[in-house]
Amino acid sequence: MFNIILAMVCALIGLIIGYVAISMKMKSSKEAAELTLLNAEQDAVDLRGKAEIEAEHIRKAAERESKAHQKELLLEAKEEARKYREEIEKEFKSDRQELKQMEARLTDRASSLDRKDENLSNKEKMLDSKEQSLTDKSRHINEREQEIATLETKKVEELSRIAELSQEEAKDIILADTEKDLAHDIATRIKEAEREVKDRSNKIAKDLLAQAMQRLAGEYVTEQTITTVHLPDDNMKGRIIGREGRNIRTLESLTGIDVIIDDTPEVVVLSGFDPIRREIARMTLESLIQDGRIHPARIEELVEKNRLEMDQRIREYGEAAAYEIGAPNLHPDLIKIMGRLQFRTSYGQNVLRHSVEVGKLAGILAGELGENVDLARRAGFLHDMGKAIDREVEGSHVEIGMEFARKYKEHPIVVNTIASHHGDVEPDSVIAVIVAAADALSSARPGARNESMENYIKRLRDLEEIANGFEGVQNAFALQAGREIRIMVQPGKVSDDQVVIMSHKVREKIEQNLDYPGNIKVTVIREMRAVDFAK
């Protein structure tokens, strides 16, 4: 544009010069021509200066316009470049995300294939190991059978040479020596037989369990023998069971309570006929859930802690009942004994509430007959206290109650009332007769007691007594509503081989002495522990 303007200025100057030249020719005189030329030159100079100034203005305006246009073009180019860069980055980001997803899928697939390969390898090793084990056991059994046959032949030949022994005496000696020498072999054979029928016993066990559930269905059993513990979520069930069931076995062994974990959401059921054990198990389980640390050592710690806490609660129950009946001056040991009755039932009736009820009834009857109301209340309240400890001390609850009443210097009328309330001895006072009548009123009213519950609890107690009668037994617990007796033995007194023999002897004694529906599983557990402290 600047060149165009410059050309126009030059053309204009040319025209002016031409005009001056023509004008000069037309002048006739030299002076006129010179004057005209001078004027024309001056005008041309003026016009040229103006043209140059105008051209400079036009050039600067053109430069400004050109710079503005260049800036606009530069901004447009930058904007297009930015948009293009954003589109490219978006495409790259999408491609990177897709590549990451593909990489994750490939990694998962590779991990899955590795796990499957490892599982197949483990199964193959396990099968090889089992095959080798079966081969070794078969060879060992054959060798033992040959040894037994040889030994029996030698025994028979040796005894046959002894003329003074009769056939029966020789038979007894053979049997005694054989049983002593082959105790390990007997235990091994029993274990082998149990393993052989284990695979076929699943269906039979399920049928027996269904029969037991049908025969024991009833509200009074559910209300008296189970406790429900609610869980925060179903994941807690796996933690309660523990690795290979160690946690749940520890809890059952320490409390003697059956822990039932089924498909019921967020619920664990504690089943057992002893309410004290069941309450300790409930407290322990709730503490474990709240604490979050669930392992055998923690379970043992909490069970011991809750046993101490249960002792305190028992004392509080006894104090509350004594205050309710109006006998606040009872000996502290008697208060604790009475508190234990909160966790004892008789034919389904709570014995502590029954004792309070008998005391109140006896007080009312004594008031009507003009007898000592406070003494009648006290005698009625204490008449069944022997039931609190009849499981730990030999003798009937009447005999135990009399012994403790004398020990803690109770009134002779109270002692006679305890002795006579079941008709074992003659009553010596009107109060003894009143308490016997109150006892009959409390226990005989409709709905107060349930015969089936008492028979059920008696069967469980008899199971435990049979097991505890064997030498070396440390603890015995009846579980699974009487379908299992679990026996803990002292490892120093009972060997591994004797454990198997003991289980069969317990089974035989149960079959001889008890009547029961279905089957009862006998489990004998021998556990050796070594504890030391680093100082």
Swiss-Prot record:
Checking Pfam families in the record gives:
HD, KH_1, RNase_Y_N
| Enzyme class, broadest EC rank | hydrolase
Q: Where is the HD domain?
A: 351-444
Question: Entry's SMART domains?
Answer: HDc, KH
InterPro entries reported in the protein's UniProt record: HD/PDEase_dom, HD_domain, HDIG_dom, KH_dom, KH_dom_type_1, KH_dom_type_1_sf, Ribonuclease_Y, RNase_Y_N
BP terms from Gene Ontology: mRNA catabolic process
Q: Which UniProt keywords apply?
A: Cell membrane, Endonuclease, Hydrolase, Membrane, Nuclease, RNA-binding, Transmembrane, Transmembrane helix
Instruction: State its location(s).
Output: Cell membrane
Assigned EC number: 3.1.-.-
Q: Segment Disordered: which positions?
A: 107-145
Q: Which GO terms describe its molecular function?
A: RNA binding; RNA endonuclease activity
Domain KH, residue spans:
225-285
HAMAP family registered for this protein in UniProt: RNase_Y (MF_00335)
* Function per UniProt: Endoribonuclease that initiates mRNA decay.
Protein's name in the database: Ribonuclease Y
Originating species: Streptococcus agalactiae serotype V (strain ATCC BAA-611 / 2603 V/R)
